[in-house]
């Protein structure tokens, strides 16, 4: 059993009644709800639609496009700001996932090369969610988390909230599961093309993100540009060109080439992110909030 899985066992709960839950029998002894397992990974999820998505995830054959993607992985399409990098490194020092009494949960983040490098040395970091890439310790619905109340020291959520039909409920769940004094670090797009994974519902301004988390009790520690206006512009151009190509494998190859060709220009955001107007045209924002003691 991995270190992250051991830590998960300490804070796992039934998503229905939120009481302690054993993964061995897959049935909650309190409310008697039973949950399935997919590809050896436990899935305490009540939403039947999500359950069906998980089933198809493991039975469908890979397309040619997906096989090419496995052979030639896509580099990160956006560039993280200096401010967001410093913030992430700082909170990982404050809430070290390797500490025995510290529980750090990653929901969604980790697919990108940037996050793989950041999280590489933390084998006790718990990953949950419905990944379109990579692995998790447990499948989970962000709007009904299978975690004990007041159990998490630090929650990461990168580019997840825009894919949820009920973001208010998801942020409410983050507040429930985080310990008093604990932190949430979230990244949410502002200007970006529609992208399904499997659905895409909303975008937020920098003030909209703060308002969303404030409504559910969080105190803002910091907010800012995660990926700037040049990233937004180049990604829109890239998507406009790529989406005009109907054939999947060729589309992926064009996207790969454009990502590499345009990437150097994204460093211009290290300059433009310093200006106030950068917030008006940014690609992504980040938000750091703390649950009051």
Where are the language model's segments positioned?
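S-adenosyl-L-methionine-dependent methyltransferase catalytic module, highlighting the catalytic core
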Residues: 167-169, 173, 183-293
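GHKL-family ATP-binding catalytic core of two-component histidine kinases
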Residues: 146-148, 165, 205
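A short SAM/SAH-binding and catalytic strip from SAM-dependent methyltransferases
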Residues: 153-165
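Helix-to-beta-strand junctions that scaffold the AdoMet/dcAdoMet cofactor pocket
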Residues: 164-165, 178-180
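Conserved N-terminal segment of class I S-adenosyl-L-methionine
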Residues: 2-148, 154-157, 280-285, 292
């Amino acid at each position: 059993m991995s270190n992250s899985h051991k830590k998960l066992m300490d804070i796992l709960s039934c998503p229905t009644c939120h009481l302690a839950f054993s993964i061995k029998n897959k049935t909650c002894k309190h409310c008697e709800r039973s949950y399935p397992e997919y590809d050896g990974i436990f899935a305490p999820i009540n939403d039947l639609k999500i359950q069906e998505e998980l089933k198809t995830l493991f039975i469908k054959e890979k397309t040619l496009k997906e096989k090419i993607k496995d052979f030639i992985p896509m580099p990160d399409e956006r560039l993280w700001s200096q401010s967001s990098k410093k913030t992430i490194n700082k909170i990982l020092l404050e809430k070290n996932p390797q500490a025995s009494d510290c529980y750090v949960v990653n929901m969604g983040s980790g697919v990108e090369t940037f996050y793989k490098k950041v999280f590489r040395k933390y084998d006790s970091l718990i990953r949950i969610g419905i990944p379109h890439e990579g692995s998790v310790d447990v499948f989970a619905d962000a709007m009904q988390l299978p975690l004990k109340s007041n159990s998490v020291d630090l929650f990461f959520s990168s580019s997840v909230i825009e894919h949820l039909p009920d973001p208010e409920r998801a942020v409410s769940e983050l507040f429930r599961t985080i310990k008093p004094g604990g932190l949430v670090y979230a990244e949410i797009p502002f200007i970006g093309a529609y992208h399904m994974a499997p659905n895409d519902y909303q975008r937020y301004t920098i003030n909209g993100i703060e308002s969303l988390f404030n409504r559910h009790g969080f105190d803002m520690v910091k907010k800012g540009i995660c990926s700037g206006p040049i990233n937004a512009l180049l990604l829109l151009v890239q998507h406009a060109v790529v989406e005009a190509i109907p054939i999947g494998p060729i589309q992926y190859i064009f996207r790969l080439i454009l990502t590499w060709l345009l990437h150097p220009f994204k460093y211009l955001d290290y300059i433009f992110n310093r200006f106030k107007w950068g917030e008006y045209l940014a690609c992504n924002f980040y938000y750091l909030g703390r649950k009051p003691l």
